[in-house]
A protein has these predicted regions:
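Single conserved hydrophobic/aromatic residue that forms the stacking wall/gate
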Residues: 1-12
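Conserved nucleic-acid-binding Ia/Ib motif block in the N-terminal RecA-like helicase ATPase lobe
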Residues: 13-59, 199-204
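Loop/turn-to-beta-strand initiation segments
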Residues: 31, 54-58, 74-77, 101-107, ...
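Conserved helicase motor
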Residues: 32-45, 62-68, 175, 203-214, ...
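Conserved motor-coupling elements within RecA-like helicase/translocase cores
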Residues: 38-59, 69-75, 211-227
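SF2 helicase catalytic motif II
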Residues: 66-108
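Conserved interdomain linker/interface between the two RecA-like ATPase lobes of SF2 helicase motors
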Residues: 125-189
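C-terminal helicase module of SF1/SF2 nucleic-acid helicases/translocases
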Residues: 151-166, 185-192, 196-343
Length: 343
């Protein structure tokens, strides 16, 4: 009678997981449900009834699961995917929903652990498993850093890549222009690309578009009718296009290491493909931004990137809610001296 819950951040991936779980469990007579922010009220009430009665055994959901009105009966296992995208309080809220005499097992999955999580693997009683090999047929993504003043040089490269049958992401950190920030926007970049090259078929996807508009752009990109998809970080998870071989990130200095690594992972997913990621930056790089760029050029290993992120940002609070910041150790260093913790 125990309930298993799998939590994802993106609605697209939730539907994929639900489809996969339904296929795996089709002969087991195990009832499962999907709960997202788009779930209609009538359907939600039916799902909640199943949770209260214990009829529902597996619940797959997004942040919607955190709502107070969602009841979790006999919760025995919590699987949190893309763990770096969830806050401490959110994960704690799930445990608050459980029976007082039942503490569920928890499995956290992440390609790039946040500093606090990495520190917890050293201090806390956590069992850690690492998959430190690339999937079969996958090659590391080559990463380079360029000043935004050289962005015109990328047009020819885009045209060559697309003529060879591959596709590219052009990622921006903002949708529309801001009076306070000097950054490249998605809408302006799409217009600029179309003006620079009549050969490129350019699409656009961001959070302000309707669901139908987003689905249309994403499907056209997957089908290959769009060469370059101008986008925001909405494509960080859940976007699997094996034909995409180039990721260009505008104003990369504004993004964290974990996010940069996740975005880079959107390309090079095809068999034996050599993919590239270009990080564009505006103005002079600060010390922290330069350290992030160097880390991205240096390695494709998510765990190594997490260690560098820990060094840059600090470990945060093991018993608090801060997920980064200094631990104020006077002599010890968490990364350098990790082997002493076991002793």
């Amino acid at each position: 009678h125990d309930l298993c819950r799998r939590q994802r951040q993106m609605c697209i991936r939730d539907r994929q997981h639900f489809k996969n779980f339904s296929q795996w469990m089709k002969n087991e007579k195990i009832e499962m449900n999907l709960l997202t922010g788009k779930t209609k009220k009538k359907e939600w009430e039916k799902i909640n009834e199943g949770l209260i009665s214990g009829k529902t055994k597996i619940l797959i959901g997004t942040h919607s699961v955190f709502q107070k009105r969602v009841s979790l009966n006999n919760l025995a296992l919590v699987v949190v995917d893309e763990q770096q995208r969830f806050g401490v309080k959110q994960r704690f809220e799930i445990l608050q929903k459980t029976s007082k005499n039942l503490m569920p097992h928890q499995l956290f999955m992440t390609a790039t652990p946040i500093p606090r999580t990495l520190a917890m693997t050293m201090f806390a009683d956590l069992s850690v498993s690492k998959i430190d090999e690339m999937p079969p047929g996958r090659n590391p993504v080559s990463t380079s850093v360029m000043s935004n003043t050289k962005r015109d040089e990328l047009i020819e490269r885009l045209e060559v890549i697309c003529k060879n049958g591959n596709q590219a992401f052009w990622l921006c950190t903002m949708i529309e222009e801001s009076e306070n920030l000097d950054v490249q926007t998605a809408e302006a970049s799409k217009k600029w690309l179309e003006e620079k090259s009549s050969d490129l078929k350019v699409g656009l996807v961001h959070s302000k578009l309707t669901k139908n508009q987003k689905d249309k752009a994403i499907n056209e990109f997957r089908e290959g009718t769009i060469d370059v998809l101008v986008c925001t970080t909405v494509i960080e998870v859940g976007m699997d296009v094996p034909n995409a071989s180039l990721m260009i990130i505008e104003n990369a200095e504004r993004l964290g290491l974990s996010q940069l690594h996740q975005l880079r992972g959107r390309v090079g997913r095809g068999p034996d493909m050599q993919a590239h990621c270009i990080l564009l930056y505006e103005g002079e790089l600060g010390e922290t931004a330069e350290a992030r760029m160097s880390a991205m050029k240096e390695t494709n290993d998510g765990f190594k990137i997490s260690e560098i992120d820990l060094e840059i940002r600090g470990s945060g609070e093991i018993l608090g809610t801060k997920q980064s910041g200094g631990m104020e150790l006077k002599i010890a260093d968490l990364i350098r001296d990790a082997q002493f913790l076991d002793k």
